[in-house]
């Protein structure tokens, strides 16, 4: 995982469905190339293969099921993600929480497959527990701020500061990123100043009238950090 990082979660937004997912991913790729930063896209499972074939930037899955490949109807395995061209996976998002034992199994399996692993957590203490599982990064995301436009870096900066302190002290090999309510380049810059190595966001980019321009705005602080 190359840092600093900007991860754009497409969620299940209609603006990022079908061919629009490819268009958004290509806008992210263009911004990444022009700014020289690492931008990752996380399309819906249905579009993951199509997107991964259409761009050269990293493509992450939004989640995975603990079941391995085989007779598991309607499940998406880590093996499926890898085969479809995914290079990483986001786990335990507040909209798709996992039991601890399942999360531990998924982190270990994903790493064994060579996938980047980002584990989401709602607060500093849970972030520390997530870091103990050995992901490449933890993303602290207070759920009450997700989708509100009230950026964690401005409305709850103490969550970032405490998480960075705890994780860097006990698991320095695990990077800390953040998300929830990130809407602007200033929000991203504030998060980076607080010690994070990147941001995870969704609607700010996906729902923008001009996604390319918005992604450039959001990613520019990363280029200034390098």
Curated annotation (Swiss-Prot):
<dbReference type="GO" id="GO:0006096">
    <property type="term" value="P:glycolytic process"/>
</dbReference>
<dbReference type="InterPro" id="IPR035990">
    <property type="entry name" value="TIM_sf"/>
</dbReference>
<feature type="binding site">
    <location>
        <begin position="9"/>
        <end position="11"/>
    </location>
    <ligand>
        <name>substrate</name>
    </ligand>
</feature>
<keyword id="KW-0963">Cytoplasm</keyword>
<dbReference type="InterPro" id="IPR013785">
    <property type="entry name" value="Aldolase_TIM"/>
</dbReference>
<dbReference type="GO" id="GO:0005829">
    <property type="term" value="C:cytosol"/>
</dbReference>
<keyword id="KW-0312">Gluconeogenesis</keyword>
<dbReference type="Pfam" id="PF00121">
    <property type="entry name" value="TIM"/>
</dbReference>
<protein>
    <recommendedName>
        <fullName>Triosephosphate isomerase</fullName>
        <ecNumber>5.3.1.1</ecNumber>
    </recommendedName>
</protein>
<dbReference type="GO" id="GO:0046166">
    <property type="term" value="P:glyceraldehyde-3-phosphate biosynthetic process"/>
</dbReference>
<feature type="active site" description="Electrophile">
    <location>
        <position position="93"/>
    </location>
</feature>
<dbReference type="InterPro" id="IPR020861">
    <property type="entry name" value="Triosephosphate_isomerase_AS"/>
</dbReference>
<keyword id="KW-0324">Glycolysis</keyword>
<feature type="active site" description="Proton acceptor">
    <location>
        <position position="141"/>
    </location>
</feature>
<dbReference type="GO" id="GO:0019563">
    <property type="term" value="P:glycerol catabolic process"/>
</dbReference>
<dbReference type="GO" id="GO:0004807">
    <property type="term" value="F:triose-phosphate isomerase activity"/>
</dbReference>
<comment type="subunit">
    <text>Homotetramer; dimer of dimers.</text>
</comment>
<comment type="similarity">
    <text>Belongs to the triosephosphate isomerase family.</text>
</comment>
<feature type="binding site">
    <location>
        <position position="181"/>
    </location>
    <ligand>
        <name>substrate</name>
    </ligand>
</feature>
<dbReference type="GO" id="GO:0006094">
    <property type="term" value="P:gluconeogenesis"/>
</dbReference>
<dbReference type="InterPro" id="IPR000652">
    <property type="entry name" value="Triosephosphate_isomerase"/>
</dbReference>
<feature type="binding site">
    <location>
        <position position="146"/>
    </location>
    <ligand>
        <name>substrate</name>
    </ligand>
</feature>
<dbReference type="InterPro" id="IPR022891">
    <property type="entry name" value="Triosephosphate_isomerase_arc"/>
</dbReference>
<feature type="binding site">
    <location>
        <begin position="202"/>
        <end position="203"/>
    </location>
    <ligand>
        <name>substrate</name>
    </ligand>
</feature>
<comment type="pathway">
    <text>Carbohydrate biosynthesis; gluconeogenesis.</text>
</comment>
<comment type="pathway">
    <text>Carbohydrate degradation; glycolysis; D-glyceraldehyde 3-phosphate from glycerone phosphate: step 1/1.</text>
</comment>
<keyword id="KW-0413">Isomerase</keyword>
<comment type="function">
    <text>Involved in the gluconeogenesis. Catalyzes stereospecifically the conversion of dihydroxyacetone phosphate (DHAP) to D-glyceraldehyde-3-phosphate (G3P).</text>
</comment>
């Amino acid at each position: 995982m190359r840092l600093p990082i900007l991860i754009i979660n497409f969620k299940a937004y209609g603006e990022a469905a079908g061919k629009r997912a490819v268009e958004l991913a290509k806008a992210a790729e263009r911004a990444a190339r022009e700014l020289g930063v690492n931008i990752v896209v996380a399309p819906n499972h249905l579009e993951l293969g199509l997107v991964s074939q259409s761009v050269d930037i990293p493509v992450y899955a939004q989640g995975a099921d603990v079941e391995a490949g085989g007779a598991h109807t309607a499940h998406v395995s880590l093996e499926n993600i890898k085969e479809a061209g995914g290079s990483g996976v986001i786990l335990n998002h507040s909209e798709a929480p996992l039991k601890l034992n399942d999360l531990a199994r998924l982190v270990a399996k994903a790493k064994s497959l060579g996938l980047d692993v980002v584990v989401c957590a709602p607060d500093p203490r849970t972030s520390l527990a997530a870091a103990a599982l050995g992901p490449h990064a933890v993303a602290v995301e207070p759920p009450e701020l997700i989708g509100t436009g009230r950026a964690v870096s401005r409305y709850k900066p103490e969550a970032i500061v405490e998480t960075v302190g705890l994780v860097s002290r006990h698991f320095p090999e695990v990077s800390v990123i953040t998300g929830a309510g990130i809407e602007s380049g200033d929000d991203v810059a504030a998060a980076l100043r607080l010690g994070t190595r990147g941001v995870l966001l969704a609607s700010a980019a996906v729902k923008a009238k001009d996604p390319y321009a918005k992604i450039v705005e959001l990613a520019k602080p990363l280029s200034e950090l390098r």
